[in-house]
């Protein structure tokens, strides 16, 4: 192979290159996957992709890529992962999950953790609601005694009693059903609260990472300014040294000329006698 031959990058990403790209994207995910779309965030994302490309190309055993190629590869991986996750969700609804789907994408769980949940969760087709069986509902969770449920039934359900009528008191199975509904509602509320806290934490992490990148940019700008000042000082010192060397050479040549015109022996001659 000749030395002047240009080596073109490989057309497709290898598995090693994809794993390196995923590791770098996970490092900067709070910036690259930020939902903000203002001009400042877009410019910051582009600078982050450029920094990611520089860090990617510094890795051994990878082909040289620019940030546009890396960004396109990440978008393709995201689209493929979202499609597979949506298909798996539909298959789970149909109770027939295919085990072969989990091998199509490298690190599917890792990629899914970097994507917002609403991106790949598609709306599943509605299913027919199963018939309600009172006996099965009575045998659900909450393995507590009937006395405990009946003692606490006022906390869950209230039945109005009309005067002059003899209505039977509610059974413990009805109280159990109501308690189960309240438990499920409480569980869903706790899940929503936990999800809200996680989103808030992710937003805070995104803001901190943006601030870190901005501080890094300011630090790099200061270093570049100091380097430029050092270069200017070195250039000024070089010019001054050249001027001094020229002056030195000038006076050396002048001294040589003076020595030739006025040799030292002429000063040793005796002066003529004065009249």
UniProtKB/Swiss-Prot annotation:
Cross-link (Glycyl lysine isopeptide (Lys-Gly) (interchain with G-Cter in SUMO2)) at residue(s): 154
InterPro entries named in the record: Myb_DNA-bind_5
Signal sequence interval, chain numbering: none
Keyword Phosphoprotein belongs to the record: yes
Pfam families, per the entry: Myb_DNA-bind_5
Coiled coil, from the record: 211-247
This protein's UniProt keywords: Coiled coil, Isopeptide bond, Phosphoprotein, Ubl conjugation
Modified residues (Phosphoserine): 96, 98, 274
All residue ranges annotated as the Myb-like domain in the record: 13-78
Family (UniProt): Belongs to the MSANTD3 family.
The protein, known as: Myb/SANT-like DNA-binding domain-containing protein 3
Annotated organism of origin: Bos taurus (Bovine)
Gene: MSANTD3
